């Protein structure tokens, strides 16, 4: 169970999986108290009977994170190779999320892929209109003569995603690494 300032915000019975709660309505000006109550066993424990240590407690970080009213909520990158294993095939989907009170209804989302020297090998921008709580944008491209990822030479690219409003004000930016490889059984 999760409590903020003495009020229960939510609960989860799933261990080993992240849990997220919107605590906005429970916060106050100044210092706030975040408390977590952990039970050793619950009615679904038998379903989690897998091959791992059955330890109780917090195993990962617990933190509060503030987001703007419109933000990059999630993204998925798929980096593969063409049929001759020479060029990279890149696909990405980016989810934007609108929170209560958002006034930004239009903007631009930019995705850039940079090689290890910092050279931009793919750059795309998409305009968007916010109509629902979630908006998804898709990107795709081919990277010629891609530097492939493998265990001996783990070549990675940086993917940078930037969100701007319609007045060109930067709202959010996130980045991660991706590698191009293809695994198959023929």
State what each model feature region is:
Residues 1-186:
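Secreted/periplasmic carbohydrate-active enzymes, especially glycoside hydrolases
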């Amino acid at each position: 169970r999760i409590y903020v300032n003495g009020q229960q915000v939510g609960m989860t019975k799933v261990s080993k999986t992240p849990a997220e709660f919107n605590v906005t309505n429970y916060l106050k000006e100044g210092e706030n108290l975040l408390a977590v109550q952990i039970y050793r066993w619950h009615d679904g424990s038998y379903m989690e009977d897998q091959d791992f240590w059955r330890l109780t407690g917090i195993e990962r970080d617990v933190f509060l994170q503030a987001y703007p009213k419109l933000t990059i909520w999630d993204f998925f990158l798929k980096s593969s190779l063409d049929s001759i294993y020479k060029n990279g095939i890149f696909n990405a989907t980016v989810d934007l999320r609108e929170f209560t009170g958002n006034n930004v209804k239009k903007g631009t989302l930019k995705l850039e892929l940079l090689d290890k020297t910092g050279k931009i090998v793919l750059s795309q921008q998409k305009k968007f209109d916010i109509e629902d709580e979630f908006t998804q944008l898709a990107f795709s491209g081919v990277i010629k003569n891609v530097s492939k990822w493998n265990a001996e030479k783990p070549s990675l690219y940086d993917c940078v995603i930037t969100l701007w409003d319609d007045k060109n004000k930067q709202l959010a930016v996130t980045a991660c690494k991706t590698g191009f490889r293809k695994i198959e059984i023929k």
